[in-house]
């Protein structure tokens, strides 16, 4: 009995050690950067989480914004559906995202909004085509679940504005739009931040 317990302890310790080593290796390795967008590229707007039925006008504004940058925009098949608190069923939301990932002509996937529901489709997705041909996944809030998963797989994503962000006061998001465009097209970004005097010098 004691021998069995010792064996189990040793076995579990080995697994934990291997997992820690793997995690450290993943942290050290550089993330793969998907190709930046160019004029003429196509992006897809999808809704992996919440409802957009009453936000079509705002999503259309997002489409017009992307088009003003020289991009083509396609909507997910179920973008404006409604199923309870979700934009569509788990299967349908997965279908839209999978279609966008698998289509080689689509160079970026832009989330229409967050809310809740993205985590429910993560395990339904097949990332084979994405790994073969990475593309930018864009959004924040609930879309962070996708960022986390894709970062774990080794790919960069953009934690940035969503389609519904176009519903904000235009004057307040001018700088957001500028930095968002630069992020998509691979232009250099620079930030000027005022430090807080209460911060300790050794803080990082």
Task: Indicate where each model-derived feature is located.
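Structural motif
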Residues: 73, 108-110, 138
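ATP/NTP phosphate-donor binding region
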Residues: 24-105
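Solvent-exposed loop/turn segments at secondary-structure junctions
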Residues: 50-52, 80-81, 115-117, 143-146, ...
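Conserved anion/nucleotide-ligand pocket segment
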Residues: 156-204
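Short, acidic/small-residue loops that bind anionic groups at enzyme active sites
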Residues: 127-150, 156-163
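Long, hydrophobic/aromatic-enriched structural stretches that serve as scaffold segments
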Residues: 99-124
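Bacterial Sec-dependent N-terminal signal peptides
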Residues: 1-27
């Amino acid at each position: 009995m004691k021998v069995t317990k010792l064996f189990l302890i040793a076995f579990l310790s080995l697994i934990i050690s291997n997992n820690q080593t793997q995690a450290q290796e993943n942290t050290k390795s550089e993330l793969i950067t998907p190709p930046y967008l160019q004029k003429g590229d196509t992006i897809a707007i999808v809704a992996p989480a919440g409802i957009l039925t009453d936000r079509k006008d705002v999503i259309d504004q997002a489409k017009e914004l992307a088009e003003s940058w020289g991009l083509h925009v396609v909507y997910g098949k179920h973008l404006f559906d409604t199923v309870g608190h979700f934009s569509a069923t788990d299967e349908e939301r997965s279908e839209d995202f999978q279609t966008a990932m698998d289509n080689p002509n689509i160079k970026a996937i832009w989330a229409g909004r967050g809310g809740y529901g993205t985590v429910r489709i993560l395990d339904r997705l097949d990332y084979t085509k994405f790994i073969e041909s990475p593309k930018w996944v864009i959004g924040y809030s609930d879309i962070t679940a996708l960022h986390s998963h894709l970062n774990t797989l080794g790919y960069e994503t953009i934690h940035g504005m969503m389609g519904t962000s176009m519903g904000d006061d235009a004057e307040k998001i001018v700088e957001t739009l500028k930095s968002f465009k630069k992020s998509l097209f691979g232009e250099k970004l620079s930030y000027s931040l005022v430090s807080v005097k209460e911060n300790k010098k050794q803080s990082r």
